[in-house]
Amino acid sequence: MTHITLGQAIWASVRPIIKIYLIIGVGFGLCKMNILTVQATRSISDIVLTILLPCLSFNKIVANIEDNDIKDVGIICLTSVILFATGLGFAFIVRSVLPVPKRWRGGILAGGMFPNISDLPIAYLQSMDQGFIFTEAEGEKGVANVIIFLAMFLICVFNLGGFRLIENDFHYKGDDDEENTLTNDDSAQQPTQPIEGNSSSSSNQDILKEPNESTVPNSSQASYISEKNKKEKTELSVPKPTHTAPPAIDDRSSNSSAVVSIDSITHSLRTNHVDAQSVSELNDPTYRTRSQPIAYTTESRTSHVHNNRRNSITGSLRSIDMRELPAEGMSDLIREYSNVDQYGRRRKSSISSQGAPSVLQADGTISPNLTRTSTLQRVKTSNLTRIITSDATVSKKDIETSGSSLPKWLQKFPLTKFFVFFLKNCLRPCSMAVILALIIAFIPWVKALFVTTSNTPKIKQAPDNAPALTFIMDFTSYVGAASVPFGLILLGATLGRLKIGKLYPGFWKSAVVLVFLRQCIMPIFGVLWCDRLVKAGWLNWENDKMLLFVTAITWNLPTMTTLIYFTASYTPEDETEPVQMECTSFFLMLQYPLMVVSLPFLVSYFIKVQMKL
């Protein structure tokens, strides 16, 4: 056994942190330069979830897990349950004793319960398998162990509905049955006079005012607008993503927006009552009526105009041109990930809500090209595809609608929808990869088709004397290698968009205490749990030191960054007080600086004292 000095142990524990934070810093810089926009972040995140991470999971498990490792898999599952329960318990204590906003009482439980078990521990292990502390083979097996931890994390967050802790914090306007029955057609037929709090936002159509319209009686506003529009002969024909304002426009309107938002153009097309001059003025905040469902304060109105201007500009610019704009922030992240409107109803696809040129005709009807959808199109737009190809698009409505295609007598069982929802989430690419890889790894003669080890039987090889299916391992190894770097870059970009707003009085105490418990006290529990596993005879330091090491560091990981995506997905796009996002941002931003000290301290102690190196 190699013996190292304390200085060597400290350096071995600090060096991986340097690499990790350099990669996170790259993501942070790309975010600030607008190279990694929120749209690009989401696209890369979905690529990681659907391709890169499943390939990495399959490759590491098949290559490094044997049939005699079933006991280790069971220990990992048990450890995961204890880890999640401990974090949940600490969060519940903090929530009960210290001030926490009522609108984040579930979010703090999720933040305490679920750690970031994916890119961070894998990157850390891959920096320590150079032979100084662990061999390359031990490092590979450690990565496989982390992936099994990740599988347990996915089961608890998605399959078992852990995301509901976050969703329960959100209470939307008009939750009563009457308002929930409103449709886009209903909102289009609303009278033009402003009615406080009685407008549906799902249609994304704003009621407009002319500059002097505030002086016109409410009863004559409709005729006023109609009479004004009769004087113009110009009508909009085919919708376009952008619309340049006419030359004859005042400075105020010109300064307000260089181009017109897609939402405004869609409104013009569907009503056919707004002329070209009116369209050019839609982004001017003075034309917005007070009938918006959320009242405008000075701050919220400024933010709303800023978002409209950004939406207008980004709709007509190339991605390289967007780098000249200010860096995207938390409001842009909400705009991209938000899946609900103010009434809690799922936001419709931008294709149908914004009226893309290929979808809406000049008369506002749906193009025949969209109605003749192919099988591929139906698959792409199905709820199942949405669930399994993204990380923050599920909600309680997906649970309620699960099993709706089953026979009526089967739907009567209360657990049917939960069972179907559980199975749906098992179809996630990463979950499928782990399940398939474990089946292959536990059947020696099947595993021999992919890799050759001392425990696999001798079977006929390919012409190059390699296993017949080794090309699959080559593919998954090559593609999966990009998963961890991309994951850390996305982590840096996400942290770069977070902003600490006005916090709930006293909440900083709750956040600081919970972060201290998670990253300073819970690692002690992890070390004690490892010691208990050895004393119980389940593991030993000679053969299972990598599993014990992985178990220890998982107790010192920060909260999952998926928390910010889930919170954004349940936040309405035009929310003026995103309390949940502000609390989540503050809570996450406290943890990553502390990890620079806490994780190397834990690793140094574990190497010198527990492993006795």
Curated annotation (Swiss-Prot):
Keyword annotations: Cell wall biogenesis/degradation, Endoplasmic reticulum, Membrane, Phosphoprotein, Transmembrane, Transmembrane helix
Superkingdom in the source lineage: Eukaryota
Topological category with respect to the lipid bilayer: Multi-pass membrane protein
InterPro entries, sorted: Ecm3-like (IPR040254), Mem_transp_PIN-like (IPR004776)
One GO term of the biological process aspect: cell wall organization
Species of provenance: Saccharomyces cerevisiae (strain ATCC 204508 / S288c)
One of the record's GO cellular component terms: cytoplasm
Any matching Pfam family: Mem_trans
Biased composition annotated in UniProt, kind: Polar residues: 187-206, 213-226
Originating gene: ECM3
Subcellular localization, as worded in the UniProt entry: Endoplasmic reticulum membrane
Keyword Transmembrane helix: yes
Main location group: endoplasmic reticulum
Record function comment: May be involved in cell wall organization and biogenesis.
Protein name in UniProt: Protein ECM3
Residue numbers carrying Phosphoserine: S291, S338
TM stretches of this protein: 10-30, 74-94, 106-126, 143-163, 432-452, 471-491, 546-566, 587-607
Region annotation (Disordered) ranges: 177-256, 345-366
